[in-house]
């Protein structure tokens, strides 16, 4: 969601943080395999810092938000596996255009580039179980062979000692 209001940025980020934390707590109580599209980390490590850098969240609000996030994370464990879809800017723009969401039509390329840089920086420092998938190479939503390759990568990362060699 894009907006230009310092007044609402903190409130909105707290809303998302609260919602995602509830999801994390619910997941921790469940023994089933759960796949999330968006993680709690993205709000705290990508979007809130971006709003702060853009001057849309005050330093005081950002510090309070970050402290609350750190406290919440001390109460739950990291996911069994974080999957990061690494993508070029042209591919990201293509995917956004394919979605056709009205509110995304005015997104600026420099905004997308900035978010992508934040994602790349954050993922480099992620210390838990991580699988990076080249989203420019693997079109797993359209190509069954790519879907199979990606599911095999996930399976190997979660359960395999030795990846299969083709």
Specify the residue positions occupied by each region the protein language model found.
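Glycine-rich phosphate-binding loop used to anchor ATP phosphates in small-molecule kinases
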Residues: 7-77
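A structural motif corresponding to the C-terminal end of an alpha-helix
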Residues: 30, 72-80, 121-131
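NTP-dependent small-molecule kinase module
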Residues: 93-166
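A glycine- and Lys/Arg-enriched "phosphate-lid" helix/loop adjacent to the NTP-binding pocket
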Residues: 45-118
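Conserved nucleotide-binding/hydrolysis micro-motifs of P-loop NTPases
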Residues: 40-42, 87-92, 137-140
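Hydrophobic/aromatic beta-strand patches that form the interior of the parallel beta-sheet core
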Residues: 36, 81-83, 131-133
